[in-house]
A protein has these predicted regions:
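Gram-negative bacterial Sec-dependent N-terminal signal peptides
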Residues: 1-22
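Early extracytoplasmic/lumenal segment of secretory-pathway proteins
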Residues: 23-95
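Extracytoplasmic ligand-binding site segments that recognize negatively charged/polar headgroups
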Residues: 37-44, 82-83, 87-227
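A ligand-binding cleft/hinge motif common to bilobed small-molecule-binding domains
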Residues: 93-95, 241-257
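A bilobed periplasmic-binding-protein/Venus flytrap-type ligand-binding module shared by bacterial periplasmic
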Residues: 142-149, 185-186, 269-282, 301-304
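Periplasmic-binding protein-like
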Residues: 205-215, 253-276, 324-325
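Mature extracytoplasmic/periplasmic domains
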Residues: 275-342
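Conserved C-terminal helix/tail region of periplasmic/extracytoplasmic solute-binding proteins
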Residues: 335-368
Length: 368
């Protein structure tokens, strides 16, 4: 695209100066897609509000990130892309990039360097897992439990999910195969390093589903990130999976009788993509926004509102206290050494390759 080549040559200069592109008038309105809840609020506080104040642009929020792949496919087919910047997990970014639905990003040309001049590609390092993906945060999917429903022996292992005798009551699991299949295999005796080798086979997929079948009657399946925290707060489940930031909110902000299980927490990345095929004025605005929102200070600022680790190395030393609670945030991050003693590393490439097929099999199993 002609504009993209132009931006590659001029973005660092024009954006660092905070000026608009001389060649392209930027759109004065943009739609940013995210997940809702505490996470979207953290983005609103750290990114959107300061950017709107700085530029005067209007930001429209859309909470459709869970459906980003299917909706962008439909928009592309219809020839009508209505989103400007989209927050997605890394695996979805890889799929969208492979399908030509997200534009490629040159980190060192399109993103801000660290304050000491370190290029963005080095500052983000290994978290730049795809050509179209701009990392924001490291988060984890883990398990929360009611402290008043587990007796004198709170769970310490992820396999408590499958121990309905020791921990009777309903569980909440996400209505998709990701994480559930991995945990099922781990708790069925598969070594951590072998999980994805097993899961790529039909036999391994069936093994995971068979393990999940042992608790299927006790599971409430969730689709929205707010579901498990609400079910925990209402005492409708004894434990359930959700994002660590959601559990932080329930535990520290709402002061509910909830504990967090860090064992086998699944590390994942979340970040931005820019849809391919945007008109030039909207593309210029989208690039201006992500340059602003992913600099060192902005990523650190997000951690004042939610317990997700910033994706830039230069942001980590700037993580301080919660903006409202005043508590130190570092110990609540999934990347804290005490919390990361037994993590499970999510395989982005595996799920980018196998997601559609395993998803179909999982949904068919749910319907049985």
């Amino acid at each position: 695209m002609k504009l993209t080549k132009l931006l590659l040559a001029s973005t660092a200069l024009t954006l660092a100066a905070g000026s608009a592109f001389a060649e392209v008038e930027m759109a004065n309105e943009m739609t940013i897609v995210s997940w809702g809840g505490a996470y979207s609020n953290s983005q609103q506080q750290a990114y959107h509000n300061p950017y709107m104040e700085k530029t005067g642009v209007t930001i429209i929020n859309d909470e459709s990130s869970a459906e980003a792949v299917s909706k962008l496919r439909a928009m592309n087919e219809a020839g009508n892309i209505t989103w400007d910047v989209v927050d997605v997990v890394a695996a979805d970014a890889l799929r969208l990039c492979d399908e030509g639905l997200a534009m490629e990003i040159d980190a060192d040309e399109m993103l801000a360097p660290a304050p000491d001049g370190t290029p963005a590609s080095e500052d983000f390092g290994d978290l730049l897992v795809g050509d179209c993906f701009i990392p924001q945060i490291v988060y984890s999917t883990t398990v929360g439990y009611r402290t008043d429903m587990v007796g004198d022996t709170p769970p310490t292992s992820i396999c408590a999910l499958f121990d309905t005798e020791g921990y009777p009551g309903k569980r909440a699991l996400e209505k998709r195969p990701i994480n559930n299949m991995e945990w099922a295999l781990l708790c069925d005796g598969v070594a951590k390093d072998d999980v994805y080798d097993v899961l790529e086979t039909d036999e391994g997929q069936q093994q995971a589903l068979d393990k999940l079948a042992t608790i299927k009657d006790d599971v409430i399946w969730w689709s929205a990130g707010a579901d498990t925290p609400q079910l925990l707060a209402d005492g409708e489940i004894v434990m359930g999976s959700t994002y660590n930031g959601r559990l932080f909110s329930v535990i520290e902000e709402q002061k509910q009788p909830v504990g967090m299980l860090w064992d086998a927490q699944v590390f994942d990345l979340d970040g931005w993509i820019i849809p391919a095929g945007l008109p030039e004025d909207r593309l210029a605005r989208a690039l201006d926004y992500v340059y602003f929102a992913t600099d060192t200070q902005r990523l650190a600022d997000q951690s004042k509102w939610i317990s997700y680790g910033p994706a830039r190395a230069s942001s980590a030393p700037l993580v301080s206290t919660h903006a409202e609670l005043g508590i130190e945030m570092a110990p609540h991050m999934p990347t804290d050494p005490e919390n990361a003693k037994n993590t499970f590393l999510y395989n982005y490439e595996f799920w980018a390759d196998y997601r559609d097929d395993i998803d179909a099999k999982f949904q068919a199993w749910l319907a049985q």
